[in-house]
Amino acid sequence: MARAIRLLAAKPRSIGEIRERLLEKNWTDAAIVDGVIEKLREYNYLDDDQYARDLALSKLRQKPQGRRRLQQRLSHKKLDRSTLDTAIKAAYETLPESDLIDTAIEKRVRLKGVPATHEERKKFTEHLMRQGFDYSLIREKLQQLEIDAAAPSNKLA
């Protein structure tokens, strides 16, 4: 029990991660670990639903990313599929994907400028796809960016 509490004190973990870490030691067996996990759940030290929601929001606030990338990152945390899906849905209700892609586009434009050539647009699109954003959303936002970029030059002429 003390080892489990020390692990949780270091950082929040899922039930699967705690189970794996406790079973690493030769002196533990599955029955003891299951008992410890049950006690931790009674004390509300372990809650996969809350852990998944907090982690999803934290990842989105750290760096804007699309659903695919977030799902891939959270899948390594040994959470069941329904918990992951619920947490991701809740995170994107709080921080809409269209706002996140706008933030990612603004950052990229600030660093590299508005893509002018076909090759630059292709690289920009690939960058956003690697961030996990959906292609249709990327295409829509980049078309809007090109319209916005062309608009000021028309006013000057």
Which residues are covered by each model-predicted region?
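An alpha-helical, amphipathic repeat domain used for nucleic-acid recognition
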Residues: 1-157
